[in-house]
Amino acid sequence: MSGIEEKCNESSYSADSIKVLKGLEAVRKRPGMYIGDVGDGSGLHHMIYEVVDNSIDEALAGYCDLIRVTLNKNGSVTVSDNGRGIPVEIHEEEGISAAEVIMTQLHAGGKFDQHSYKISGGLHGVGVSVVNALSEWLELRIWRNNKEYFIRFNNGITEAPLSIVKENIDKKGTEVTFFPSVGIFTNIEFDFVTIEHRLRELAFLNSGVKILLIDNRFEEVKKVEFFYTGGIEAYVQYIDRAKHAIHPCIVVNTEHVESGISLELAIHWNDSYHENILCFTNNIRQRDGGTHLSAFKSAITRVITSYLDTTGLNKKTKHDFSGEDTREGICCVLSVKVPDPKFSSQTKDKLVSSEVRPVVENAVYTKVLEWFEEHPIEAKAIIAKIMEAANAREAARKARELTRRKSALEVSNLPGKLADCHAKDPAISELFIVEGDSAGGTAKQGRDSKIQAILPLRGKILNVERARFDKMLSSEQIGTLITALGISVEREFSLEKLRYHKVIIMTDADVDGSHIRTLLLTFFYRHMPELINKGYLYIAQPPLYKVKSGASELYLKNEQALQNYLIKSTINDTKLILDGQEQLIGYNLEDLINKVVQFNCLLDRASKKFNRSITEILAINDLFNKKIFEPESGSRLQKALDVLNNLEESPDKTNLQVLKHENRIEFFHFSRGLKNTKILLKEQLELFEFVEISQFALSIFDIFSKRLKLIVKGKEFDVVTPSQLLNTIIECGKKGITIQRFKGLGEMNSDQLWDTTLDPTKRTLLQVRVSEVDEAEGIFSTLMGDVVEPRRLFIQANALNVMNLDI
């Protein structure tokens, strides 16, 4: 550095250079430090959690048993509870109400006073004030002293002091409504499932507290109630619902008086090969564990060692067991309440309070060992499970050593099937995992060999959910994949030697391709989770259609994209004549067609519950509601059915007749002497899907109540229903073009595969992410495990949602 540069730096660095961010300005300047990532949605949802945590703290103190979270139509969120209500008195030091202090100043609140809250997860005045700072507006209502108080903030700034808006109110509690700042968050749309997961978690951890989640954003109001009296024991049973437990739950509930630390523990071993331990401190999840997790692991190992020594079972073991062996198949929820917890970061993902370790370790060791001694039969089953794990680990070790010795003698240890790339930098290298040699050959020809490697997998891929670790290592396909990636798995897992930073699963669009993709995802989730956590795992999105018009070609991802293309290709040459006079063209016609497309989607969704053609004709005549049961609707109903009977392409063109009863309507026709009947129940008309169809039909009712003539490229068509209109336009759009549907990757040539799926500048990739670990755990166990009942229930619950089934 030159002398001039030194002088410049010295002169510019003075007292004036030190900027002090006052009030909540610091939060708005660096929101990520306080609320988490503002781009990926985690920080946005943390806004809700911060407010809910304060209500939970009221519950922990014994003053609250009902919490309500409402997602409002305008995009705001309301969180209310029936606790004591935030204090409203004037704060002596600040000269404003305590409520305003809490909402506008960091590090101000009741959690710093040990008399107000013995245990707390969030900090009033840190959490809530941050929410206020990061909201476009926030409204606070407090019910306290038989009065209702109100105050509103804009971007964290008080509009007017706290005021009394109602008196003689027999109610206590707090209600916070906030609208996230568009300038802070990339996306301000809340995800119902993400919130549902966290609230369910809190309900399990706080037995006896009822939490309501209400979503008012859509026409169908969604409401979920969480209330569990079984506590964390019920939580473990919920997490492990798709596995076989080998013994009843072990429950530990104790408090260390001197430190004020309390412990709740529910644990059982199941017949799976994976451990699942959830750790919480003051209701906050620690994804990276901490001192409580270390203490638990140490205590469990000590319990098993001590029990083996006491009973003499250690003499029967073939191999020494490790800590990992003791936790194979374990499912545990560990919850500690700590008066003044210390975490490694603002996100509280790791507990570092050293005083927690001895309390947890001693309590777990004492209570679990006591349970083992009182339940010798169950204890013996657990020991057998652990010894089996030790034997499998030893077998896996020998298999690895054999593989290493074999590899050391070979010039190259890369699998022969792998067509590797020339690049040695993992950051730019990609590995495509493809199904079979046929697709593999095409992919090898079409790839960019500089950065893209191709690995074809042939034969049946092992379902690792049902296989031991040693059996998995002996699988040819899994072994080939592990070798190609350059890394080992499980205990030896490290991403340092990973040869590709994009691992892309590329399978066919049929049922076999979906199955292979699921098996591969199961392997990566179970044995290479860091690959997913780092964002290295992707799923390719090959097109389903190729459209050729003259010399031009276009690839389309799915059925919806094809439909949109066909509509757009004809819209400029299309007009709709209403009652022989008025005509719809251009934007107005496009708007109608968009509505018809939406209407068709609603009909498709409801078609599993009632006949589609009848639903449509009733809806566009304003009869797919309770009006159909009114006596005066008879003539309109018969007229609608006459229209349906006369439609040329109607599958129900068999002289459909109707018979009305008090609470049901029978639609019937005779075919080959047999009576075919479809029954519409009065109560069915209250189903959300049916109400949605009825209401949406009103937006196109005026159009379809007229006589319609569709003109496409000079050709005229009489149309009556929305489906007829849409199908006519689509069929006209197909004329003069060639549409090819790809069933598998092998049907494409190398150039097509490059243009659609391999070319980094044109392709679409789906990145695999796991947002909620225990929910993912449940899904993989349900779909890929060996317990049939949860899978049967899952299929029954979701079967009607399947639109296209490949069988």
Curated annotation (Swiss-Prot):
GO biological process: DNA topological change; DNA-templated DNA replication
Reaction equation(s) it catalyzes: ATP-dependent breakage, passage and rejoining of double-stranded DNA
Cofactor binding note of this UniProt entry: Binds two Mg(2+) per subunit. The magnesium ions form salt bridges with both the protein and the DNA. Can also accept other divalent metal cations, such as Mn(2+) or Ca(2+).
Tree of life domain: Bacteria
Cell compartments where the protein resides: Cytoplasm
Alphabetic keyword roster: ATP-binding, Cytoplasm, DNA-binding, Isomerase, Magnesium, Metal-binding, Nucleotide-binding, Topoisomerase
The protein's name: DNA gyrase subunit B
Organism whose genome encodes this protein: Rickettsia typhi (strain ATCC VR-144 / Wilmington)
Biological classification of the source: Bacteria, Pseudomonadati, Pseudomonadota, Alphaproteobacteria, Rickettsiales
